[in-house]
Amino acid sequence: MEKKLMRIGVSLPGELLDKFDKTLMKRGYSSRSEGIRDAIRTYNQHYEWMQQIKGARAATISLVYDCSKKGITSTLAKIQHEYIDLITSSVHFHIEEDFCFETIILEGEGEKIVELAEKILSLKGVKHSRLTTMPEVKTE
């Protein structure tokens, strides 16, 4: 079965593309296209994994964001207040003049945790984010 290849155009900051190209060279990719295909496959697998998160969970959302982006700090606070029933704690600190690192510790229903993570992960200005989750452990 022949797979049809589609040609796309993507606009990226030069610094991001340079870093991507260097990573591809270090990892031995034969082309930028193959690296992009691999990155898209990984992104899709992560999304599919997130859709399987169900039931009682303990989780963290860790993110690095550009706090100089207009409105991002207040938007993050607003989103977190919408999910206050899930959030048990958070830690926030400044890693550079314009960048903050935050870890949000959560406990609750998996679907709601994913919903919160999706809202945060998609914000413009979030440079890196990671959802980590595990089934809630009950000790009796």
Swiss-Prot record:
<feature type="binding site">
    <location>
        <position position="94"/>
    </location>
    <ligand>
        <name>Ni(2+)</name>
    </ligand>
</feature>
<dbReference type="Pfam" id="PF01402">
    <property type="entry name" value="RHH_1"/>
</dbReference>
<dbReference type="InterPro" id="IPR014864">
    <property type="entry name" value="TF_NikR_Ni-bd_C"/>
</dbReference>
<keyword id="KW-0804">Transcription</keyword>
<keyword id="KW-0805">Transcription regulation</keyword>
<dbReference type="GO" id="GO:0006355">
    <property type="term" value="P:regulation of DNA-templated transcription"/>
</dbReference>
<dbReference type="InterPro" id="IPR045865">
    <property type="entry name" value="ACT-like_dom_sf"/>
</dbReference>
<dbReference type="InterPro" id="IPR013321">
    <property type="entry name" value="Arc_rbn_hlx_hlx"/>
</dbReference>
<keyword id="KW-0479">Metal-binding</keyword>
<comment type="similarity">
    <text>Belongs to the transcriptional regulatory CopG/NikR family.</text>
</comment>
<dbReference type="GO" id="GO:0003677">
    <property type="term" value="F:DNA binding"/>
</dbReference>
<protein>
    <recommendedName>
        <fullName>Putative nickel-responsive regulator 2</fullName>
    </recommendedName>
</protein>
<dbReference type="InterPro" id="IPR010985">
    <property type="entry name" value="Ribbon_hlx_hlx"/>
</dbReference>
<keyword id="KW-0533">Nickel</keyword>
<feature type="binding site">
    <location>
        <position position="92"/>
    </location>
    <ligand>
        <name>Ni(2+)</name>
    </ligand>
</feature>
<dbReference type="InterPro" id="IPR027271">
    <property type="entry name" value="Acetolactate_synth/TF_NikR_C"/>
</dbReference>
<comment type="function">
    <text>Transcriptional regulator.</text>
</comment>
<dbReference type="GO" id="GO:0003700">
    <property type="term" value="F:DNA-binding transcription factor activity"/>
</dbReference>
<dbReference type="InterPro" id="IPR002145">
    <property type="entry name" value="CopG"/>
</dbReference>
<dbReference type="GO" id="GO:0016151">
    <property type="term" value="F:nickel cation binding"/>
</dbReference>
<keyword id="KW-0238">DNA-binding</keyword>
<dbReference type="InterPro" id="IPR022988">
    <property type="entry name" value="Ni_resp_reg_NikR"/>
</dbReference>
<dbReference type="InterPro" id="IPR050192">
    <property type="entry name" value="CopG/NikR_regulator"/>
</dbReference>
<feature type="binding site">
    <location>
        <position position="100"/>
    </location>
    <ligand>
        <name>Ni(2+)</name>
    </ligand>
</feature>
<dbReference type="Pfam" id="PF08753">
    <property type="entry name" value="NikR_C"/>
</dbReference>
<feature type="binding site">
    <location>
        <position position="81"/>
    </location>
    <ligand>
        <name>Ni(2+)</name>
    </ligand>
</feature>
<dbReference type="GO" id="GO:0010045">
    <property type="term" value="P:response to nickel cation"/>
</dbReference>
